[in-house]
């Protein structure tokens, strides 16, 4: 089984904000794979489907970002999913707008959703796709920046990043994550 988690905040208020790029990419994957998110368990909505010989689960936590681990860990335990069968997709202030970076492990880098996952999983060793949202303009508070929607000039870059991330997930269904990293980084 392969589990793909997109991080974000629940509710209309946060739809299509920078911090919710993980949710947006899960939605894109669901559309590409014809895999509706029609189930709910452990503070998350998800969908599952067998693709070839692999069962794939797409998941969006219903907790707020900084509590993401509370939704993901029970789900992984219940379905007996290992850390190398997990990919987490999330926004990254330290990457330029629209740039993606795949990693097999790493620190939270100040991201509260990843901090929560590390705390609940007990390790930094899990696959991730970091999606660049850039940094706020001088003086703009980070919290306002990440919870805001994209500027018009950012939309094409973010759409491209979402598409590339979805393609990386599709590739991971057939290849080891390290191979996918080498292709998409």
Swiss-Prot record:
Which residues are listed under the site Discriminates between blocked and unblocked aminoacyl-tRNA? 9
Q: Where is the signal peptide?
A: none
Instruction: Return the annotated site residues (Stabilizes the basic form of H active site to accept a proton).
Output: 91
Question: What are the UniProt keywords, alphabetically?
Answer: Cytoplasm, Hydrolase, RNA-binding, tRNA-binding
Keyword tRNA-binding: yes or no? Answer: yes
Catalyses which reaction(s):
an N-acyl-L-alpha-aminoacyl-tRNA + H2O = an N-acyl-L-amino acid + a tRNA + H(+)
Its GO CC terms? cytoplasm
Q: Which residues form the active site?
A: 19 (proton acceptor)
Record bears the keyword NAD: no
Q: Which GO terms describe its molecular function?
A: peptidyl-tRNA hydrolase activity; tRNA binding
Q: Name one Pfam family in it.
A: Pept_tRNA_hydro
The EC number(s) attached to this protein equal 3.1.1.29
Biological processes, Gene Ontology terms = protein quality control for misfolded or incompletely synthesized proteins; rescue of stalled ribosome
Where's it mainly located?
A: cytoplasm
Residues that bind tRNA, according to the entry?
14, 64, 66, 112
Where in or outside the cell it occurs: the entry states: Cytoplasm
Database matches in NCBIfam families? pth
The record's family statement is:
Belongs to the PTH family.
Subunit structure, interactors included: Monomer.
The function of this protein is: Hydrolyzes ribosome-free peptidyl-tRNAs (with 1 or more amino acids incorporated), which drop off the ribosome during protein synthesis, or as a result of ribosome stalling. Catalyzes the release of premature peptidyl moieties from peptidyl-tRNA molecules trapped in stalled 50S ribosomal subunits, and thus maintains levels of free tRNAs and 50S ribosomes.
Query: What is the name of this protein?
Result: Peptidyl-tRNA hydrolase
According to its UniProt entry, this protein's organism is Shouchella clausii (strain KSM-K16) (Alkalihalobacillus clausii)
Q: What gene name is given for the protein in this entry?
A: pth
């Amino acid at each position: 089984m392969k589990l793909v988690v997109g991080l974000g905040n629940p509710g209309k208020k946060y739809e299509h904000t920078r911090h919710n790029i993980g949710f947006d990419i899960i939605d894109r994957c669901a559309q590409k794979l014809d895999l509706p998110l029609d189930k709910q368990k452990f503070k998350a909505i998800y969908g599952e489907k067998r693709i070839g010989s692999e069962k794939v689960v797409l998941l969006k936590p219903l907790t707020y970002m900084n509590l993401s681990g509370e939704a993901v860990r029970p789900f992984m335990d219940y379905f007996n999913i290992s850390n190398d069968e997990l990919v987490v997709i999330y926004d990254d202030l330290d990457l330029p707008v629209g740039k993606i970076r795949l990693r097999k492990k790493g620190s939270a880098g100040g991201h509260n959703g990843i901090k929560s996952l590390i705390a609940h999983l007990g390790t930094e060793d899990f696959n991730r796709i970091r999606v660049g949202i850039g940094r706020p303009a001088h003086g703009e508070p980070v919290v306002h920046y990440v919870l805001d929607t994209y500027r018009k000039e950012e939309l094409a870059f973010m759409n491209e990043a979402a598409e590339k991330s979805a393609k990386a997930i599709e590739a991971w269904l057939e290849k080891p994550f390290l191979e996918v990293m080498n292709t998409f980084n």
